[in-house]
Amino acid sequence: MRPRSRPPRPRPRRHPARVQGSRSREGRRRREASQHRSIPASIRKVLFRSPTKSNRMLRILSGIYRSRRLDSPDGDDLTRPMTSRVKESVFGLLRGWFEDARVLDLFAGVGTMGLEAASLGAREVVCVERDRAVLGWLRRNIESLGCGDRVSVLVGDALAAGTLARAGGLFDVVFMDPPYELMQEEKSLARVLDAAARVREVMGDRGFLVLRRPVDPNSPPPPTLEGFDGPEVHDYGKGMQVLLYCPRP
């Protein structure tokens, strides 16, 4: 006796509204993808970032804003902020210098250093940044922390002679964290060091200039700066040094 064959299972009917909704969503995704491809990759990275990834990386480490997040673009194409370990070490070296201090943050980026100083009690922080793509992030971080009464943004070239004059007054601590590209090419490095020496004009007889630089086995010795004593050299791994200079009276 031959086995009885099973009748084929009926296919489930798809609801017309669901089919239409699925198609419309797929069409919308394709249109958005096509629009995104027409935007240059460097700008696309900023506009269509991953908030979770970027926000998890940057935080205020201590002070009144401790653990508050700093918003930033993904990747290293626009900013290269110090890691939390390096930043914690640098601020540990300068412990006690920020209460009621005036701080100048050159190449401020999204405000990693300047806003940490504000959290530790700085009376005034001036953040110098020229990159229009980064300025929006910096201003949003200042607004998010609610410290706009003490932290200002100066739009300009940190290496230009007139920028320091526009900052106004004397500063107790100056952070100088140029893009690595400027520190690796001979002509641009000379400009950075000239600008670093000019910082002496906006500092009193006491304080610190903090300069970060990339290093490799072929790097020259840490530079001396006219008008400053030092540097005191702090190595972080094989590829980075933080140099501390003190104004020479």
Model feature map: region roles:
Residues R2-P249:
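Class I S-adenosyl-L-methionine-dependent methyltransferase catalytic core
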